[in-house]
A protein has these predicted regions:
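Conserved adenine-nucleotide phosphate-binding loops and their immediately adjacent elements
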Residues: 61-73
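Phosphate-binding P-loop
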Residues: 89-97
Length: 181
């Protein structure tokens, strides 16, 4: 039995490593065929890996709050705006490599919608970064000073969705705005 645990560890199969004894008992109790046993075992491992991947993506996205699309209120919008927001919620804009800009008065829910879109994107196993524009500008300036701007820009290629928040609250430095836009 120890060889199962050590091999699962070596092969990076955390579900099997942590649960193999119970899985074997359950398979014996239910008289599963080898095929059924392996199918269940590998499906559980895949599910665990997917869940762990999503958890990592959510953590690395750096969302300021957990805000979900299911909790987003569409009551304050007219029919045309509701239709557009529902279309955005499909995330088709990501697959189409389109940009969207959410703008409006403070307190209308732009950040809630943006974070909700980001969380939904993570749940689809895609990479997201949430960053405020003031913090991004600070990072850009630092990278310009260190002559690391090319590497910094390259980092953004791994993201399926980059959410820039608080764009309207700052004045733009000329050099930084050329990089940003």
């Amino acid at each position: 039995m120890d060889s199962i645990k050590s091999n699962a560890l070596y092969l990076r199969l955390p579900y099997i490593k942590n649960n193999y004894k119970e899985i074997i008992k359950e398979a014996e109790m239910n008289e599963l065929s080898i095929s059924e046993f392996l199918t269940d075992l590998l499906q559980n491992e895949a599910d665990t890996r997917f869940k762990n991947g999503v958890s990592t993506k959510l953590r690395l996205a750096k969302f300021p709050h957990k805000l979900y699309l299911e909790d987003y209120k569409l009551d304050n919008y007219d029919a045309g705006q509701r239709k557009l927001i529902k279309e955005i919620m499909t995330l088709d804009f990501i697959n189409n490599k389109e940009n969207i800009i959410l703008f409006g008065n403070p307190g209308v829910g732009k950040t809630h919608l943006a974070v909700g879109l980001g969380i939904k994107t993570c749940l689809e196993n895609k990479n997201v970064l949430f960053i405020s524009v003031p913090n991004l500008m600070i990072e850009i300036k630092e990278q310009m000073t260190l002559n690391q701007l090319h590497r910094f820009k390259k980092r953004f290629e791994k993201y399926d969705l980059v959410i820039l928040d608080e764009m309207g609250y700052i004045s733009f430095d000329k050099d930084v705005s050329e990089v940003l836009f």
